């Protein structure tokens, strides 16, 4: 074929070396070919610099970074283009779960008929998706690609020019952006080149938004299923299966009983507006489960907004959550909506909720109780409707007892607690997760690596104190350093005494039950009293090993030895007093008073 696909437009558009201009190339075709062929596939070549690229991309970017739903973003993109290009009609078409193009947002055209998935020019759209290359048809009347839709495309306006570009993310074509307009005999090749370049960059920005919203064609439902109707569909109802609520959490991998129990709880909890408190060690996937609750809830069409409370100071946190007025403080050059406003009607995830200061806890409590707030520096009261999900790996009960966390706020956020199991309590899921992470690495790096059964067995025996996050890092590190297409046991750092995490894992080498002694991250402490004084042999790292005892029995033994003083029992077990207190509550052990 004479031309090459315009694959790298998105990358070039945001090149650090050329921030204000995009250099692309177009293979020069003889003039007779341009007019006679009716269809021309374009490839990169140096194009003319024009303000259209800078100002236009800025406007499109502003549309895509809003907190609106994906359908609304795409609709706003297609409706912004007429102010930038001399277009008559246009549409964004995304490849659905079954591989069929589905019109998602339109401008200037009637919605597809009942049961139809596209507006017009299906053959042209199929060509763009299949080849991943732009398509320019100067006169649709002369192209066999448009014969079936010729009447609807021309519709009394005379000759029509068609321009379509692929929507690409990570070298995968996720859909098509196309426009058409009345043919302009004065249009030059340079003008076509500039418009193709600009549309390609817009399409790739839109594709990135599709990818980030989890609507890839290979593992998600069609975009139209996100709402009760398509953007361009007016009051036309979608087929019955589209209106059904999703019931699967496809991105949570695992079949262990501990995980499935949490998943089933998520499905039940998601149908309500109750506050949820996700608890578990770092790396257990609290954000994934929060997203699952949102996607399975009636609020799934509204925004899902998240904020890590531990990363911000109290002053900044207040501004981030509540917003601020112009001039409220130094640097507040404009009014800004807070996360509560952005999440209105949807779901707000507050990660590391246990790290917020007592002073700010009172302000947060008022918002949760009254459903209203004022921006920093403002006096106007704003009403918000937000479903709150909080996450923490902190022992909030001990924090309440010690006065570090308000009891009334604790009761407000702890309506439905969900405890996420650490990876070592579901090690049967490790091979599945490892394969998923390796497949992702292969796609990103164009590799074809695979594990041997022995390698998967090695992974299954690891403790992974960092849980799923650490497992992913382990897989990526091993895959990066692998010297052959097959990963064998000797490729793992832990087999060569080069893995620090394997040393941390030795501190958790005794048997652990569900939500056991380390409900939070296990960490080795220097014991004041010898673990052997409990009557058990010392295990790796100097910690006690009692294979015949359950965690509950081991905890009771330590407490009895310590005279039911939690701090002393913590030193015996190599834990913190907070972890011991957490374990006592999890195992429903009543502390005896001596």
From Swiss-Prot:
Any one Pfam family match given in the protein's UniProt record, by short name: HTH_8
Record-annotated DNA-binding residue ranges: 566-585
GO molecular-function term, one example from the UniProt record: ATP binding
Binding site for a divalent metal cation: 494, 499
Amino acids binding ATP: 280-287, 343-352
Domain of life where this protein originates: Bacteria
Residue ranges of the region described as Inter-domain linker: 481-551
Alphabetic keyword roster: Activator, ATP-binding, DNA-binding, Metal-binding, Nitrogen fixation, Nucleotide-binding, Plasmid, Transcription, Transcription regulation, Two-component regulatory system
CDD domains in the record: AAA
A GO BP entry: nitrogen fixation
Region of interest (C-terminal DNA-binding domain), ranges: 552-594
PROSITE patterns cross-referenced by the UniProt entry: SIGMA54_INTERACT_1, SIGMA54_INTERACT_2, SIGMA54_INTERACT_3, SIGMA54_INTERACT_4
Domain GAF: 69-210
Disordered, as annotated region: 213-243
Domain Sigma-54 factor interaction stretches: 252-480
Positions of transmembrane segments: none
SUPFAM superfamilies (alphabetical): GAF domain-like, P-loop containing nucleoside triphosphate hydrolases
Described purpose of this protein according to its UniProt entry: Required for activation of most nif operons, which are directly involved in nitrogen fixation.
Quaternary assembly: Interacts with sigma-54.
Protein name: Nif-specific regulatory protein
Species this protein is from: Sinorhizobium fredii (strain NBRC 101917 / NGR234)
């Amino acid at each position: 074929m004479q031309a090459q696909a315009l694959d790298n437009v998105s990358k070039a558009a945001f090149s650090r070396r050329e921030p204000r201009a995009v250099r692309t190339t177009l293979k020069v075709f003889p003039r007779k070919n341009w007019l006679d062929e009716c269809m021309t596939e374009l490839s990169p070549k140096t194009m003319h610099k024009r303000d259209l690229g800078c100002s236009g991309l800025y406007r499109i970017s502003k549309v895509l970074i809003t907190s609106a739903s994906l359908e609304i973003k795409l609709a706003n993109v297609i409706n912004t283009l007429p102010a930038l290009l001399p277009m008559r009609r246009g549409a964004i078409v995304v490849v659905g779960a079954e591989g069929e193009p589905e019109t998602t947002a339109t401008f200037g055209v009637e919605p597809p008929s009942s049961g139809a998935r596209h507006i017009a020019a299906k053959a042209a759209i199929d060509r763009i998706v299949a080849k991943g290359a732009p398509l320019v048809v100067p006169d649709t009347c002369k192209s066999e690609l448009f014969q079936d839709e010729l009447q609807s495309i021309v519709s009394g306006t005379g000759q029509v020019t068609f321009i379509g570009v692929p929507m690409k993310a990570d070298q995968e074509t996720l859909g098509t952006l196309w426009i058409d307009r009345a043919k302009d005999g004065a249009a030059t090749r340079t003008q076509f080149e500039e418009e193709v370049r600009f549309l390609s960059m817009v399409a790739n920005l839109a594709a990135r938004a599709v990818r980030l919203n989890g609507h890839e064609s290979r593992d998600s439902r069609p975009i139209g299923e996100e709402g009760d109707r398509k953007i361009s569909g007016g009051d036309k109802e979608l087929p019955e299966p589209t209106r059904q609520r999703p019931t699967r959490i496809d991105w949570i991998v695992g079949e262990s009983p501990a995980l499935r129990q949490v998943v089933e709880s998520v499905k039940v909890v998601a149908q309500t507006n109750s506050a949820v408190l996700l608890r578990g060690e770092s790396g257990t996937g609290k954000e994934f489960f929060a997203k699952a609750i949102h996607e399975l809830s009636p609020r799934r069409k509204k925004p899902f907004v998240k904020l890590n409370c531990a990363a911000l100071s109290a002053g900044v946190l207040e501004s981030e959550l509540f917003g601020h007025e112009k001039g409220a403080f130094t640097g507040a050059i404009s009014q800004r909506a807070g996360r509560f406003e952005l999440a209105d009607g949807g779901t707000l995830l507050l990660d590391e909720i246990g790290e917020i200061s007592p002073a700010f806890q009172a302000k947060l409590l008022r918002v949760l109780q009254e459903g209203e707030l004022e921006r920093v520096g403002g006096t106007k009261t704003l009403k918000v409707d937000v479903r709150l999900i909080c996450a923490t790996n902190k022992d909030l009960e001990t924090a309440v007892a010690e006065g570090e966390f308000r009891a009334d706020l604790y009761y407000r956020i702890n309506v439905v607690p969900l405890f996420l199991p650490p990876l070592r309590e579901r090690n049967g899921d490790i091979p599945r997760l490892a394969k998923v992470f390796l497949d992702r690495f292969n796609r990103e790096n164009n590799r074809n690596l695979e594990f041997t059964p022995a390698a998967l067995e090695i992974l299954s025996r690891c403790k992974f104190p960092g849980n799923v996050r650490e497992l992913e890092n382990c897989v990526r590190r091993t895959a990066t350093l692998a010297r052959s297409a097959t990963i064998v046991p000797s490729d793992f750092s832990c087999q060569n005494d080069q893995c620090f995490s394997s040393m941390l894992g030795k501190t958790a080498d005794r048997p652990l039950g569900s939500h056991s002694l380390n409900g939070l991250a296990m960490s080795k402490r220097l014991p004041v009293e010898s673990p052997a004084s409990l009557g058990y042999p010392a295990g790796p790292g100097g910690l006690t090993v009692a294979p015949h005892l359950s965690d509950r029995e081991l905890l009771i033994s330590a407490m009895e030895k310590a005279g039911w003083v939690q701090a002393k029992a913590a030193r015996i077990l190599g834990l913190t007093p907070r972890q011991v207190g957490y374990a006592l509550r999890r195992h429903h052990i009543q502390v005896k008073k001596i």
